[in-house]
Amino acid sequence: MTDCHAQLLPIYFREPSVNLGLGSQRGKLPHLTGMALLKDARLYADSPEAYAFTSLDFERAAKRYGKVGGFAHLATLVKRMKASRPGALPLDGGDTWQGSATALWTRGQDMVDAAKLLGVNLMTGHWEFTLGAERVQEVVEKDFKPAGIEFLAQNVRTTDFNDEVFKPWVMRTLN
């Protein structure tokens, strides 16, 4: 999972209408939007997939299909995944601890607690670092380590000696 932006409840989510790819990536997935995305992915307009992945006819589609996401739905998916794939490791790709009023008020703690309840095994940060290095370290030490959640980041280093702050990768043997 990734990029829930601290939204615990379902929301009306609108994909961007522009996503510029640079150089050789211009005009290719994942930098396609709208009809170009639907055509490339072989999806139909006026479908649940069009609503989920494009901004086309957003207001009408939102009225038709409703809100998306939320941690209750995500928890159901994680539960199904773990049941059908024993040993699966839910990975949080970041952008989880920020983006809502409650996350702002709690410095991301509401989302940290939600990730622990969800059963996340591994996480890497993204905009979590806007909370500051001390806060990220605090969550890793006081919340994640006791819960058995590993925090990974390959591009976070100390300023003094350029040492890694977090493990850059992990390997697990499953089943």
Language-model features, listed with the residues they occupy:
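Acidic, metal/ion-coordinating pockets
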Residues: 1-175
